[in-house]
Every structure is written in structure tokens, then in C-alpha cells.
Amino acid sequence: MIFQALAAADTPYQYGGQSHATGFDCSGLVAHVYRAAFGLVLPHNSRAQSKLGETIAREALQPGDLVFYNTQGQAYSHVGIYLGEDKFIHAPKPGSAVRIESMRGNYWTRRYNGARRIASL
């Protein structure tokens, strides 16, 4: 699964996108990775994804867990995939590309909403 996520690095952001060909938005990246790795069909919406699986405490995060942020003034408006060592991969915003970032940065720490582990894994 982490391989599929890392393979998306540097793919351009595209609202509504969920493939290497079209680009990715945040929830489209998550949906693509889970479909490619496990054959799971996840909703293409970060808030809907935030209701899947089980809640995970930040200190219990494992690679593959979903991490959620408030980036638009609403809880769970952004999602990424935890990679380990306080890093996650995500599709940040228009004009950017899929990239790895540290969860320790001030921007992400202040906006952290929680994490989920998809139960069927």
C-alpha cells in the first residue's frame, strides 16, 4: 500500500481527480491507493472517509492509516495517508502536486482532526 501511495508522488493536484492520468485531489488519492492496494472502494470525499474504520490515537498511528485535517474551516476537509515517522503523503491544493510532509509542522499540527484505520485491513 505504501508503494502505491509513494508512486503517486509528484502527480499534479486536480480537483475531482483520482488517477495518475487525471491527477489527484486529497480524497481521490486515498481512494486510488486503497483500490489499487486492496481492491477496496472508498468514497471520494474526505468527510465520508473520516467515518470509515476505527478511530486511532495519534501516538498509535501505523503506516496506511488515514490522517485528517481542517484546511477549509471545516473539520475533516483534508485527508492524507500516514507513512510513519510523523510523515504523511497527500494531494495538498491546486497548483501543487502529491507530496510527503511532516505532521510536526506548525500548520499541520494546528489543523489535525484525527486518524482512522480502515477496519477491513
Regions found by a protein language model. Give the residues of each.
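Solvent-exposed polar/charged
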Residues: 7, 35-36, 81
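Short beta-strand segments that buttress and anchor functional surface loops
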Residues: 65-71
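Structural motif
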Residues: 64-65, 86
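Aromatic- and glycine-rich peptidoglycan recognition patches
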Residues: 40, 56, 70, 76-77, ...
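Intrinsically disordered, low-complexity
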Residues: 1-12, 117-121
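Catalytic cysteine-centered active-site loop
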Residues: 11-63
